Amino acid sequence: MAEYGDQYGRQTDEYGNPIRQTGEFGATGAYGANQQYGTTGTTVGYGTDQCVTTVTTGAQKTDQYGTPGTTGAYGTDQYGTTGTTGEYGTHGGGIAPGATDAGLAGGGGGHRRLGSSGSSSSEDDGQGGRRKKGIKEKIKEKLPGGGHGDDQTHPTPPGSGGYGYEHGGAAESPEHEEKKGIMDKIKEKLPGGHH
């Protein structure tokens, strides 16, 4: 039986954490957030000695650890953490569309080539100024036959694989073609074969 001064039952556990009150079904809603059911202001009771809780539809709820969650939000989990929707995860390299390569241009800790044989990190912008080269342009300059100054692709004659490789086989047919990353494309163009 509840003590005299404790009319709502115990509000915390033995460690001082708030206890999750009953009065909801706990079912997962349409977008992964807990939804409350019942009429606004309905009192739900389970006997005389049980905790009586007033359920208000649309009120902010807390999870089982007392962390407030967002009711009706997309992707909230049992800890009240809001997830993101529509994301596909991260990939292991490359530059996102619209991003700059400022972090990659410095060369951070790799081998650095000294002398005049290295390529410049900027080029003429055609209007009397300079513009920073992207990583794509730098790689093109380093590849055999690179550094043409134009960004147009030249078609490879049928039957020639370019750089001594043969094209053909089931792996390169259009119906079984896999999307290749930028690193795979660079590795294919480097002399020395497929690593």
UniProtKB/Swiss-Prot annotation:
Q: Which residues cross the membrane?
A: none
Q: Which compartments is it annotated to reside in?
A: Cytoplasm; Nucleus
One Gene Ontology CC term in the entry? cytosol
Q: What's a BP term from Gene Ontology annotated to this protein? A: cold acclimation
Q: Tissue-wise, where is it found? A: Expressed in roots and leaves.
Extract the ranges annotated as region (Disordered): 1-195
- PROSITE patterns of this UniProt entry? DEHYDRIN_2
Relate the induction remark in this record. Leaves exhibit a diurnal pattern of expression with up-regulation in the morning, followed by a midday maximum and a 2.5 fold down-regulation in the evening. Expression in leaves is unaffected by salinity or dehydration stress but is induced by mannitol. Mannitol application, salinity and dehydration stress rapidly induce expression in roots.
Q: Does the keyword Phosphoprotein apply?
A: yes
Compositional bias ranges of the Polar residues kind: 50-64
**Keyword set for this entry?**
Cytoplasm, Nucleus, Phosphoprotein, Stress response
Which ranges are annotated Low complexity under compositional bias?
Answer: 37-48, 65-88
Where is this protein primarily located? Answer: cytoplasm
Basic and acidic residues bias located where? 136-153, 173-195
Reproduce the UniProt comment on modification after translation.
Phosphorylated in vitro by CK2.
Q: Which family does it belong to?
A: Belongs to the plant dehydrin family.
Protein's recorded name: Dehydrin DHN1
Organism in which the protein naturally occurs:
Avicennia marina (Grey mangrove)
